[in-house]
Amino acid sequence: MSEMTPREIVHELDRHIIGQKNAKRAVSVALRNRWRRMQLSGDLRQEVTPKNILMIGPTGVGKTEIARRLAKLANAPFIKVEATKFTEVGYVGKEVETIIRDLADIAVKMAKEQETKKVKYRAEEAAEERILDVLLPPAENQWGEKEQNEDKGTRQTFRKKLREGQLDDKEIEIDVALPQVGVEIMAPPGMEEMTNQLQGMFQNLSGSQKKKKKLKIKEAFKLLIEEEAARLVNQEDLKANAIESLEQNGIVFIDEIDKICKREGSNSGGDVSREGVQRDLLPLVEGSTVSTKHGMVKTDHILFIASGAFQMAKPSDLIPELQGRLPIRVELEALTAGDFIRILTEPNASLTEQYIALLKTEGVDVDFTQDGIERIAQAAWQVNERTENIGARRLHTVMERLMEEISFDASEKSGEQLTVDAKYVNDHLEMLVENEDLSRFIL
């Protein structure tokens, strides 16, 4: 779990996302409150529930990007889902409980990686001994029994060569565990739990079989480390720790929640199904127990962050019960031409940096001047204003169109230099930007 302060979280988000100060502050406080809650005594800790967040803002302003970056910072089980992927119980499609089941899989994977790191040194030692046993097999006595090889000097010599990588390309034959047979079972919606149980049963029937395999020592060492680490990790404890981490620190990000709103004045059957998805989400957000293949998961203390553009619907179109479960509202602002200039230059691995690096691989040096960047930003903003406003995503379209010619010819122009200034941008984009019909179809 992340121990970063809200200021540190905002600073980290600032490296990748321009503007949206309020949204960054809200998610940073929510993330820090997870840590604060864990410092409380047992009884009080159970009473402190997370304050779920609803992010409202037009498309392309950074809602999803905040979620992506938050996932890396959280160091906790995190899942991002699209609300439109789910259907009401009884309809064909995924049920909302699969969110928690998928999150449980993520939590177990994270716990496995953490536990494997703890035993990595012991696993490496055990794998090393197994390889040395293959390289220096113990001699057999007259009764066919294996005797311990007492020549420690030879073993140490081989150990030194092994650690220095001198034996990496030597082939050896080792016993490796066969991967468990994966059985794909197609089941109707709502039967995911039964499917998981059947798959587990078939995997157990296959057992842990081994077979001899000829591999280079470098590859064999990796396989043996994985085998030894799996043997050293207690699987039951691992699952228990994963579920504990999920229940106390889990975060669910639900994108496009506005698409499951019942629009005002609409009485279509599709809207009924959408409202059903909201009602199915309620128990999860409110706190319920979900059955997963790793065990029962309580959702009482999982943090839910929902986001939507709310262009066709309003937050008040959500069912009242769900509105009440999303107490913190954050509005993200539409991006201006000035924001576009910052997006092109300030973030880590900005768009201009990416194009410079990509064309550098062909030997072409690209230089973006300040007036060139300003003209690109202005062009993207103009197209957004005249057609559909898709936010910062418009920059990708404009940049791809602008760099199309040099990207195509780059392999034949190795050693050349290209300066992208205002004149270059005007020559390549002006007609498209000024002509609204062309903008609609090309940009």
UniProtKB/Swiss-Prot annotation:
Subcellular localization, as worded in the UniProt entry: Cytoplasm
Give GO cellular component annotations, separated by semicolons: HslUV protease complex
What InterPro entries does this protein map onto?
A: AAA+_ATPase (IPR003593), ATP-dep_Clp_protease_ClpX (IPR050052), ATPase_AAA_core (IPR003959), Clp_ATPase_C (IPR019489), HslU (IPR004491), P-loop_NTPase (IPR027417)
Q: Which residue intervals make up region (Disordered)?
A: 138-158
User: Mind listing the UniProt keywords for this protein, alphabetically?
Assistant: ATP-binding, Chaperone, Cytoplasm, Nucleotide-binding, Stress response
**Gene3D superfamilies assigned to the protein according to its UniProt record, in alphabetical order:** 1.10.8.60, P-loop containing nucleotide triphosphate hydrolases
Q: Name one GO biological process term.
A: proteolysis involved in protein catabolic process
Q: Which CDD domains match?
A: RecA-like_HslU
Q: Where are the compositionally biased (Basic and acidic residues) regions?
A: 143-154
- GO molecular function annotation: ATP binding; ATP hydrolysis activity; peptidase activity; proteasome-activating activity
User: What does the entry list as the binding residues for ATP?
Assistant: I18, G60, V61, G62, K63, T64, E65, D255, E321, R393
Q: How does it assemble?
A: A double ring-shaped homohexamer of HslV is capped on each side by a ring-shaped HslU homohexamer. The assembly of the HslU/HslV complex is dependent on binding of ATP.
Q: What does this protein do?
A: ATPase subunit of a proteasome-like degradation complex; this subunit has chaperone activity. The binding of ATP and its subsequent hydrolysis by HslU are essential for unfolding of protein substrates subsequently hydrolyzed by HslV. HslU recognizes the N-terminal part of its protein substrates and unfolds these before they are guided to HslV for hydrolysis.
Q: What is this protein called?
A: ATP-dependent protease ATPase subunit HslU
Organism, by scientific name, is Pseudoalteromonas atlantica (strain T6c / ATCC BAA-1087)
- Recall the taxonomic lineage recorded for the source organism: Bacteria, Pseudomonadati, Pseudomonadota, Gammaproteobacteria, Alteromonadales
